Amino acid sequence: HSGKPCEGWESFKTRKEAQERKITVEKELLDGTFLVPDTMTVEEMLYKWIPIQSTKHKWSPKTYTQSVAMVQNLIVPYIGKRKVQELRTYDIEKFYATLAKTPCGQYVHGVKQTLTDKQKKRLLSSTSIHEVHTLLKTAFSYAVEWDLIHKIPLPRDAPKVNIEER
């Protein structure tokens, strides 16, 4: 931000709604809690974050490939189109529950696959879901730094890893 005032527009059905929003925005500006409304999706955020993260932390080619695959196949098909600012902890908990019922290989390179009945029975491991959580936690911490959101929308507790799976 250059320090210059920036303008934006919001529409409301009634004058009362507009006045209430104005009061809220002015209060948030005074508190320092105002976020500029942003339409960035989870998918857009993750594809901005991966190159930064991978360069900053010198990811190996394997880590890079696995992270991109996780985003393409496990995150984007389910919550990728959601706006970062609209995502809540409840949405992430629902997403984890969906992943727990998702067959391995449901998506390959982001494309939904036709699976056999046998393949449909082999579900994602709790380890995979935990890895998704770890990736999202790091990515959303950047979203906080980038002033897209105030807090990370992930559940306080990470999904449990079931040791008996192995």
Tell me what each language-model feature is:
Residues 1-39:
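Short, surface-exposed polybasic/aromatic micro-patch for ligand or macromolecular engagement
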Residues 159-166:
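Short, intrinsically disordered, charge-balanced linker/junction segments flanking boundaries
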Residues 36-144, 153-159:
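Short, Lys/Arg-enriched alpha-helical recognition elements, typified by the DNA-recognition helix
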